[in-house]
Regions:
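Short, conserved alpha-helical segments within structured domains
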Residues: 47-48, 206, 227-231, 264, ...
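Phosphate/oxyanion-binding loops and surfaces in catalytic or ligand/nucleic-acid-binding neighborhoods
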Residues: 84, 239-242, 274-279
Length: 312
């Protein structure tokens, strides 16, 4: 990657690997090509990592992943001296083991810090010099100046505030920000089709059902956070395996699909339970269970909605 990449050509090439996200792709490209660091704010499973990986591959630069949590100390982020060698040789540059921040700076890569606001304050403060000066000094190891293509890309989940840290103005003032929300239904159907060979043996009708029930988790009143599109993908994959075991050859024409007692709807309920019950997060004030919520959503799709559509 050069310091002034052709962002139009990059956008066109990267877009061929994505379903939707053209607008977000343009904004991310514009920010990183302008030399800016960036925080992406959105729930898991919205394509943030896919976008960054595609851009990094297109530009031929490495992508370093770090998970933000209470265990991410400054030493784990920046690096540390090898204790065994220190005992023999004392502290020196030779026995310093660089962490992902220094590796990204030295190699001109993207440092992707997930769950940015879960990292401790002292760890986040170590980023200030890298963000402001593109240079960091490590005691007894010297200074590292970032290669021009180095960028910090952070991510945050706005739907989950448990165990998070309020970011200081000194950090947020040095970052651009982009909200990345769930995609629309058509885009999610396209993603699931792509990842499941158009629904496999059960066909595209299963894909539509899976996407519908999965999206319904995001608006259920008892849930603090619903499932990403990964839930719909897993519904389809699990349902196809169940169908093979149970001898359900296809998903159905309109008659059997609307009959909640037929094999296909029951199969979808079982697949939903496996795929969604661990992905959805109950509201703290809720007195229900994940399995009950899944069953309610299934009933909305296969019992209540078809009944409402019946004439008379």
């Amino acid at each position: 990657m050069t310091e002034t990449p052709d962002v139009a050509q990059t956008r066109n090439r990267v877009a061929t690997h994505l379903v939707g996200r053209e607008h977000e792709l343009e904004l991310i490209l514009s920010a990183v090509a302008a030399g800016r660091d960036l925080v992406l704010e959105g729930p898991p499973g919205t394509g943030k990592t896919t976008l960054l990986r595609a851009i990094a591959e297109e530009w031929g630069i490495p992508l370093f992943y770090v998970e933000g949590n209470a265990d991410l100390t400054p030493a784990k982020l920046v690096g540390h001296h090898n204790p065994a060698r220190v005992l023999k040789e004392d502290y020196s540059e030779d026995n310093f083991v660089p962490g992902p921040l220094l590796e990204a700076m030295q190699q001109g890569g993207f440092l992707y810090l997930e769950e940015f606001n879960r990292a401790p304050d002292d760890t986040l403060n170590t980023l200030l010099a890298a963000l402001a000066e593109r240079r960091i000094t490590v005691p007894r190891a010297g200074s590292v100046t970032a290669v021009p293509t180095f960028r910090l890309i952070a991510s945050m989940n706005p739907y989950d505030n448990v165990g998070t840290t309020r970011l200081s103005t000194s950090i947020t003032d040095r970052l651009c920000r982009l909200a990345v929300d769930y995609q629309d239904e058509a885009a999610e159907i396209g993603i699931v089709n792509l990842r499941t060979d158009k629904g496999g043996a059960l066909g595209e009708l299963l894909v539509k059902d899976a996407v519908w029930v999965n999206r319904a988790t995001r608006r259920h009143p008892d849930l603090r956070q619903g499932s990403s599109v990964r839930g719909a993908i897993d519904i389809v994959l699990v349902a196809n395996q169940l169908a093979a075991m149970r001898g359900v050859a296809e998903a159905a024409d309109s008659t059997t699909r609307l009959d909640a007692e037929s094999a296909y709807p029951k199969l979808v309920l079982d697949a939903m339970t496996v795929a969604l019950s661990g992905r959805i997060h109950l509201d703290e004030a809720s007195d229900t269970t994940a399995e009950r919520v899944v069953k309610e959503i299934w009933e909305d799709r296969f019992i209540l909605s078809p009944a409402a559509a019946q004439p008379g």
